[in-house]
Amino acid sequence: MKMENLISMFCFSSKGSSKRRTKGSSTWFPQPDQHITIRTFRRLKAHQMLSHTWTKTETSLTMEVSKSMADQLEEVNSLPTTLMPRHSIVDPSYRPSIY
């Protein structure tokens, strides 16, 4: 699928062993050389962290229309990941936004 055709993003969040899930998706048609930011968050496993942290990957890039979606995603996935403190240490109801 070519980048100028469609970008579709799906995300989900679940809390503990709860069966309730919040799902979201968005679809848009990017323009050539359109600048976009991709942010992803994932919870680290207990043995990977000393305190409550989120793994955050934030990428700002100009999508290249000539590359396939798979190539674009592979490039984003290869970028380094940084650790950030989880804000819910103060407020347990806080959930970081992916937008």
UniProtKB/Swiss-Prot annotation:
InterPro entries, per the entry: Gemini_C4
GO terms (BP aspect): symbiont-mediated suppression of host innate immune response
Taxonomy, superkingdom: Viruses
Pfam families: Gemini_C4
Keyword Ion transport attributed: no
Claim: Cell division is one of the keywords in the record: no
Transmembrane segment boundaries: none
Keywords tagged on the record: Host-virus interaction, Inhibition of host innate immune response by virus, Suppressor of RNA silencing, Viral immunoevasion
Stated family: Belongs to the geminiviridae protein AC4/C4 family.
Function statement: Pathogenicity determinant. May act as a suppressor of RNA-mediated gene silencing, also known as post-transcriptional gene silencing (PTGS), a mechanism of plant viral defense that limits the accumulation of viral RNAs.
Protein name according to UniProt: Protein AC4
Highest classification ranks of the organism: Viruses, Monodnaviria, Shotokuvirae, Cressdnaviricota, Repensiviricetes
